[in-house]
Amino acid sequence: MRRTLYRLMIELTNGRFTSYILRKFAQSRLSSIIIPSYAKVFQINQDEMEKGLKEYRTLHELFTRKLKEGKRSIDTDASSIVSPVDGVFADHGPIEDTKTFDIKGKRYSIVDMLGNEERAQRYAGGTYMVIYLSPSHYHRIHSPLSGSVTERFVLGRKSYPVNAAGMEYGKEPLSKNYRSVTEVNSDGEHMALVKVGAMFVNSIELLHERDTVQKGEEMAYFTFGSTVVLLFEKDMIEVVKELKSGQELRLGEKIATRLAHK
């Protein structure tokens, strides 16, 4: 009953019109009135911001802010996979041969997440990693490795929240929400970077258009907090053992190691 009521509430309020109104407000000068309160409530680290708080004219500008030069360093080890975002490490684990994985008791389909069987088959037996971005985090997304971009595509329309309630009661938000996917071929092995939209504000802006990408290079930004899912082929990586659920991650921090193949 609780799950049904939750989903009904989301469906009734999470339409195109609602999203449009909220997006327009966030991009308007009127939204600047709540910037100080927003920064205080979400405890935004103002020392890292490229500009002073008063220089942001709209909430959208604050959401998509850049960091001061040198505030993040990208792990330079050739075998490292780095966090593509600032966020909270949610989970990681194996992708079953059935092309599914489990998070918090809910089963997710890679076929649904990527849109078809052919794409999903690449990741059967591989590894998934999930990183959650709250409204307080830096919202720009960077590449976790270097390689050639093989595909970019968008799926889904509406979005459930990706907080604890959304993960428990929502309709498989990681594989059904509005999402933008970038696939990268790195030395013959594939990784999918799945950028999952948050409730109401689905916008994910792509910034990278070249055929190749370097580790740490900026690729896109969220216009609000959301989630990133990383999918890796079988025997491609080993997740850093020290990573724990709930741990804060910073852009460029090593999260996995590429496995050597003879």
UniProtKB/Swiss-Prot annotation:
The keyword Lyase applies. It is found in: Cell membrane. Its EC number is 4.1.1.65. The record marks 225-226 as: Cleavage (non-hydrolytic). It catalyses: a 1,2-diacyl-sn-glycero-3-phospho-L-serine + H(+) = a 1,2-diacyl-sn-glycero-3-phosphoethanolamine + CO2. The keyword Lyase applies. It holds the Pfam family PS_Dcarbxylase. The active site is at 86 (charge relay system), 142 (charge relay system), 226 (charge relay system), 226 (schiff-base intermediate with substrate). Keywords: Cell membrane, Decarboxylase, Lipid biosynthesis, Lipid metabolism, Lyase, Membrane, Phospholipid biosynthesis, Phospholipid metabolism, Pyruvate, Zymogen. The modification Pyruvic acid (Ser) is found at residue 226. It is a peripheral membrane protein. GO terms for molecular function: phosphatidylserine decarboxylase activity. GO terms for cellular component: plasma membrane. Binds 1 pyruvoyl group covalently per subunit. InterPro entries: PS_Dcarbxylase, PSD-B, PSD_type1_pro. Is synthesized initially as an inactive proenzyme. Formation of the active enzyme involves a self-maturation process in which the active site pyruvoyl group is generated from an internal serine residue via an autocatalytic post-translational modification. Two non-identical subunits are generated from the proenzyme in this reaction, and the pyruvate is formed at the N-terminus of the alpha chain, which is derived from the carboxyl end of the proenzyme. Pathway: Phospholipid metabolism; phosphatidylethanolamine biosynthesis; phosphatidylethanolamine from CDP-diacylglycerol: step 2/2. Its cofactor is pyruvate. Belongs to the phosphatidylserine decarboxylase family. PSD-B subfamily. Prokaryotic type I sub-subfamily. NCBIfam families: PRK03140.1, PS_decarb. Catalyzes the formation of phosphatidylethanolamine (PtdEtn) from phosphatidylserine (PtdSer). Heterodimer of a large membrane-associated beta subunit and a small pyruvoyl-containing alpha subunit. This is Phosphatidylserine decarboxylase proenzyme.
